[in-house]
Amino acid sequence: VYILECSDEKSRARNYAIVKAVAILGTLLVPLLRATLMQNVSERWHVVYLVPAIIGFVMALFALLFAKETNVFLTKRIEYLKTPIEEREQRSKEEREQNAQGGILTAVNFAFKHRQLRFLIIACCCFYLASLGTATYSTVMAKSALMTEEEITLALFLYPVGNALFTLISGFVSDKFGRKITIIAMSCSALACYLLFILSGMFKWTPYLTGFAIGGFMGSYWGAGDTIGGIMFSESSPTNLRSSVTVINTLLNGVMGGLATVITMILLPIIPEKMFGYMYLGLTVPGLVGAIVIMWLFVGETRGLDLKTVTGTEWDKPKKN
């Protein structure tokens, strides 16, 4: 939300993608620490993640102390403070009646009453069913592809590169061609990259290609995911509900990811470890296809909208008299 509100309409997705891509390159620390502190001994994995955790905490504290409030929020706040008290009370009463005062329950209620956010939620439900591939690539490399710890470390050196590259691509495509085209293109890219990851690992191609492919999948998948659940949710919500509405996306990710995990728990005992990768590939297809269809048919384009004036009702069909 902060990045989006600090950007103009024409460069919103691009700026979001640039910041995220730079952050992703920071995960090069993981293979570097695997090769140095962990020394490719799997029992020492906790040492690898301790250093990035400390760095992340320090940077979050730095942002908390020194980041300024966004102009979008300040404009709304100043406008409110300049309003006479009587008018504020009347406006507050009207906003309460319209469920527009913030909070997760209010945001959910508001979202299901309005066409755009309602179908974005449905699209996200489909999309996050395919999220298993983002959390299981280490298992696929170790159990299905039978890669050694050294090979996995080499693959992880190219993972952030592929991830950052496809993240950048999604941002530039989104601002140039629109949100819908981005979701379709990056979803197709995610399927292609995951297939390449499986083939490269299973047929013992170079681990660098394996790492780049899974990085490309992650960048493509979350490039589409950020566009659906991050950018489009924000661009389809009024300012006073924007943060709460984006929390819905996070909750959907957890709920649908949990459902996908339950499905795999049922399948894993009856599927050989060698086939895990193919199983995860098969589970990504229905969710991504469903999200593409819903986005294309039922969700309106949001590129170029002014976040200061969005009400969330722009896509509602006129009520019949």
Model-assigned labels for residue ranges:
Residues 176-187:
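Cytoplasmic membrane-interface "Motif A"-like loop-to-helix N-cap segments
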Residues 114-164, 257-261:
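Extracytoplasmic gate region of multi-pass secondary transporters
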Residues 77-118, 317-318:
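Juxtamembrane intracellular "pre-TM" segments in multi-pass secondary transporters
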Residues 46-65, 278-296:
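Symmetry-related core transmembrane helices of the 12-TM Major Facilitator Superfamily/SLC fold
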Residues 1-7, 224-237:
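Intracellular juxtamembrane helix-capping segments at the cytosolic ends
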Residues 188-204:
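C-terminal ends and interior cores of transmembrane alpha-helices
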Residues 11-39, 55-56, 249-261:
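Glycine-rich segments within core transmembrane alpha-helices of 12-TM secondary carriers
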Residues 207-224:
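Hydrophobic core of transmembrane alpha-helices in multi-pass small-molecule transporters
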